[in-house]
Structures are given as C-alpha cells and as structure tokens.
C-alpha cells in the first residue's frame, strides 16, 4: 500500500483521493499524536489557501480535531508560512494547512506543523498514518465538556503582515514592484506588506474565486509577470505559488531570477554583513552548478541535500546554518521563519536591492547559470518509485550518464506529490540535452504505465 504522506503532507484530488472522510480521520489522528503529551486542552491552528475544496476539507478537519477533545483555531485564508509563524506567536500546540501548493485547483492537501512551527518528521507522519490505517480504536471519543470547540483567529492575517514588515530595516520608497499572487493565499498578505514598507505596486492574479488558483499564473507560469514588469517599468517582480511558501523573481528586463539566484544574492549579502552562519548556503542536488561556482568565487560553502525543503531544513537545523532553499523558490531564512516563505523571500531580496543601489539584473549577474533541461515522464503513480527496478530503464539511465560524464550531469528523481519521474540534464549543448532528456522520459513513460 502506498504511503499516505508524501514529501509535503497528504495530497490528492479533492473529494476522490483526499475526501472529507480522510480529512476527518487526519484531524482526529493528527490532533491526538501532536498533543497527547499536553496537560491542557490542546489548541490547533487551521488555515487554507483559496481552493474551492478548502471549505469542505476545513469543516471535516475541524470536526476531527474537536472530536478528540482538541480546540480548533480557524484562521481562514493565509499563507502556509503564516501558520508556521502564528503557531509560535499564539503558543498553540500544532498547526494544519489545507493546500496543494502549486498544483491545479482539483488537488488539495493537508500538512501539519508542530508547536515550534516545523513540518513533521517522517516518524510522526508514520505514527499518524499507522493510527488511521491500523489502530483508530486507540483514539479518544470524549463526550459532554470533553469535546473540543472552534474559535476564530481574527487577527491572524494582520499579525502575520506585522511580522513580515519587522524582518527588514529597509524602506522600499522609490521601488516599483510587480506582484503575481497566483490567485492564492498571498493575495492579501503580500501586497499589504509591500505597501506598508513603502513600495509602489502593480499587481496581477490577486482575485481568487476558488477555481483560478495557479491557473496560468504564479511561480509556475511566469510569462504574465515578465510582461508586466517590462511594460510598467518595474524595478523587480515577484511570483508566488498557491500557498505562498515559494517565490520566484523577475529582473527589470523581464529575466527570471530563480531560487538558486535568490540564494546567491541573499547569501552573499548576508556574508558581506557578517550574517551568514558558517559562511554556508544549503541547496539541493537540483541546485544549478552555477551556484557552486559562485560559492567558490565568493568563499561561500554550498551544501547539497536531497530535493525537498524539509531536507534542506533538516540540514540547516542539524548544523546551524541560516539560509537554504531550492531552485523552485522555496527559500528558508531561518533567522526569521521555520519554513519557506514567499513574501519573506521577496522582502529580503528587496532589502538587498535597496541596500546595494543596484538593479536587479546586476544583482543576478553574480551567478552564471549552467543550462539545464528538465523533462517530466508521467507514469503509473504506484510504479514511480521503482523505476530503477526496470532493467531497460536502468540501462537507459546508465547510458545517458555516460554521454554527459565529461561536460555535465544527469539527475533522475521522482516527484513527491505527482505521478512523475523527472529527468534533469545539466550541460553545455541544450539541443542535445533536450533530445536526450525527452528520449529517456519517453522510455520511462513506456515502461512504467
């Protein structure tokens, strides 16, 4: 049986895979596991992004939480990183975010945070899953005054915005910023925070209707933002994903500034200010080789973890580093928050822009990007993690690695949230890379149906 939890909580098509019944069971088991050591009636923050399925899942989740005697503190639509922050600020026992991040509207997800604002370890997720699948009878079913209640965190959005504005000493007067809010959870927080810090704004995709989240917008569809930056003469642009835990940027010329370049820009600025812990940036195996080359030039250590912001965070916590992230735009500023935070990332990058007096394109020039090609193979979800067990696929990967051994690298990995095997090639000949990546992806699709 496939594991219920993926790399970022439980995720699936709402109402068929992620049903109200499953949300109820997750609420019960999650509340129990995360609060069973507390000596008081536990309180758990619940928030969501703008998907139409959010109301259904919130109702079921809250019911599950209350049914084991915990209290649900409902915050409504706020970004995922707001949950991480507010759990700590309000001294709550846990937090839950209902979101499928960058996925299309038909998907939704549920991810938990502990009382310190961190995503759960594999061990805790396994404990929750084991109770749901095998031992639901151990869960309490109190009656009368033992039941939990629901309350509303009416100041949640304002408190999160106030936190964001305190993460910089800079004022952004005179800076024109373009925002693409992905019709998602950032649609209020990001514009208000930027305006409070003095920036002038032009905004797109900030009118969510429940169905338009991530729809040809946000950090996975950057064309609208690039066009708006150039047409409006903006100094920089930022795009968020559906739950606003990631951010990508666009310079004044309309060129992409991805997560690797954001790490390079902000990491170097931190080093120059004496604020970069152990002169180290934590990336992943998907980080562009250009980031490593920048690190060597600027005397900054670049470490690599497995793909996934949870693994970046684990390394940061284990060894005392304070900045890390992924090419996709998950950037963790551990001095400020315990998870990737898109609006916080935008504010930190704007702060560097303000301090330096440079244009965004000039800042991005500190890192030269090595060409990468990424092709997704859509496969049977039950087979995606066993691709190396297929002899034909294994030989195909070995042959590809041999072709690029001298002037590039090949990385094959599975998606933690979708039925995909990703083929990434880094090198110098883009035409050759693209052809070879597509060839291998087609082979993987054929073999893993």
Spans of model-derived segments:
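Phosphate-binding and adjacent anionic-ligand microenvironments
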Residues: 236, 273-449
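An N-terminal, well-structured beta->alpha segment
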Residues: 1-63, 67-68, 149-177, 385
């Amino acid at each position: 049986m496939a594991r219920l939890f993926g790399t970022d909580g439980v995720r699936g098509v709402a109402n068929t895979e992620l049903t109200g019944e499953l949300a109820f069971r997750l609420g019960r088991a999650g509340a129990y596991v995360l609060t069973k050591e507390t000596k008081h009636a536990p309180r758990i923050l619940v928030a969501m992004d703008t998907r139409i399925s959010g109301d259904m899942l919130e109702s079921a989740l809250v019911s599950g939480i209350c049914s084991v005697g915990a209290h649900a503190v409902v915050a409504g639509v706020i970004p995922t990183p707001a949950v991480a922050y507010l759990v700590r600020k309000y001294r709550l026992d846990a937090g839950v975010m209902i979101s499928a991040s960058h996925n299309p509207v038909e998907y939704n997800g549920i991810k938990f945070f502990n009382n310190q604002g961190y995503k759960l370890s594999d061990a805790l997720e396994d404990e929750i899953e084991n109770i749901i699948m095998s031992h639901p009878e151990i869960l309490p079913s109190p009656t009368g005054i033992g039941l939990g209640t629901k309350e509303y965190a009416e100041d949640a959005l304002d408190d999160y915005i106030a936190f964001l504005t305190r993460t910089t000493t800079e004022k952004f007067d005179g800076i024109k910023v373009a925002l693409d809010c992905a019709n998602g959870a950032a649609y209020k927080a990001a514009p208000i925070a930027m305006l409070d810090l003095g920036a002038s704004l032009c905004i797109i995709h900030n009118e969510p209707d429940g169905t338009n989240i991530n729809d040809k917008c946000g950090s996975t569809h950057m064309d609208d933002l690039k066009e708006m930056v150039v047409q409006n003469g903006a100094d920089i642009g930022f795009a968020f994903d559906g739950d606003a835990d990631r951010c990508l940027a666009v310079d004044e010329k309309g060129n992409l500034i991805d997560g690797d370049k954001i790490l390079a820009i902000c990491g170097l600025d931190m080093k120059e200010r004496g604020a970069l812990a152990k002169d180290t940036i934590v990336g992943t195996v998907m980080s562009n080789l250009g980031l490593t080359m920048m690190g060597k030039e600027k005397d900054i250590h670049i470490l690599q973890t497995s793909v996934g912001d949870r693994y970046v965070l684990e390394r940061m916590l284990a060894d005392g580093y304070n900045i890390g992230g992924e090419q996709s735009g998950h950037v963790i500023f551990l001095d400020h928050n315990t998870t990737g935070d898109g609006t916080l990332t935008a504010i930190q990058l704007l702060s560097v822009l303000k301090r330096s007096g440079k244009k965004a394109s000039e800042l991005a020039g500190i890192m030269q990007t090595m060409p990468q090609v990424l092709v997704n193979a859509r496969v049977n979800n039950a087979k995606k993690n066993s691709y190396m067990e297929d002899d034909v696929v294994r030989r195909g990967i070995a042959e590809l690695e041999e072709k690029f051994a001298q002037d590039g690298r090949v990385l094959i990995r599975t998606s933690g949230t979708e039925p995909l095997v990703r083929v990434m090639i880094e090198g110098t000949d883009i035409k050759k890379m693209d052809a070879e990546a597509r060839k291998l992806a087609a082979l993987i699709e054929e073999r893993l149906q």
